[in-house]
Amino acid sequence: MKCFQKLYIFILILIVLMAGCESNKITGDSKETQIKKSFAKTLDVYPTKNLEDFYDREGYRDGEFKKGDKGKWVIRSEITTELKNENMVSKGMVIRLNRNSRTCTGEYFVRIVKEDSEGKVYSDERKYPVKMENNKIIPLKPIDDEKVKKEIEEFKFFVQYGNFKELENYKEDEVSYNPEVPIYSAKYQLKNSDYNVEQLRKRYNIPTKKAPKLLLKGSGNLKDSSVGYKNIEFTFIENKEENIYFTDSIYFNPSVDK
C-alpha cells in the first residue's frame, strides 16, 4: 500500500512539474511576441517624411536631462562599402534637431579607411557642414566637388522612407530584452523582396545580390512610445576581405552636450 502511495505521490509531482514547464514555455513565447509588438510600436517613427516633426516628438528621458530641457534628436544614416583589395568607403549624414531652439545643424561626411603595405590603417574623413530649413538640407559652405554637392542635395535619411509595418512577419534569429536598463535587440534574416531592402538598393550602389541580415538595437521603455536611441543595421556582406552594410541611428539626448 505504501508503495502505491509513494508511486501516486511521485506521479502527482511529475504532473505538476510538467505543467510548470509547459507554463514557462507559454510565458516565454508570449514574452517574445510582446517584444516584437513593442518593437513595431517604437518603430512607428519610420517613416517620418518631414524631419521637422521631430521637434514635437518626445523621447525617453534618463537622469541626464535637466528640468525644462526638451532635448535634441540626433539622426544618422550611413552606407559603408569595402570590396576585395579596395579601401573601405563610408558616406552619410548626421543632423541634430534641438527641440528647445527648433534649429537643426549637422554634417555630410565621406570617410576613407586605407591600409598600407605594412598593415597600418589610416582614416581620411571630410566633413561638409549643413543645416536644415523647411525640411531641406542646405550646405553651410560652398562646395566645389559637384558629386558631393549632388549627394547632399539628394540625400534622404532612412527614417524618411524606411517602413517596418511587416515587422511582425519577420522571422527572427534572436530577440533579447533587458527591462532594467532598458535595452533590447533583435536579429532577422531578410529577403531581397523586402521593402526596406528594395529601397536601399534603389538609393545606393550595393554590389551584391546577397540578401541582408537586419539587426535592431534600442533603449527606452517598451511599454510606452518613448525612444532613447535606436540603431538599425542591414548587413549584406561581412568578412575579413569584404564588408557592405548600411546603418541608421536615432538618439534622444540632452540639448547641451557635456
Curated annotation (Swiss-Prot):
Keywords: Cell membrane, Lipoprotein, Membrane, Palmitate, Signal. Residues 1-20 form the signal peptide. It is found in: Cell membrane. One of its GO terms (cellular component) is plasma membrane. The keyword Ribonucleoprotein does not apply. Transmembrane segments: none annotated. A lipid is attached at residue 21 (N-palmitoyl cysteine). It is a lipid-anchor. Its main location: membrane. It comes from the Bacteria. A lipid is attached at residue 21 (S-diacylglycerol cysteine). Belongs to the staphylococcal tandem lipoprotein family. This is Uncharacterized lipoprotein SAB0395. It comes from Staphylococcus aureus (strain bovine RF122 / ET3-1).
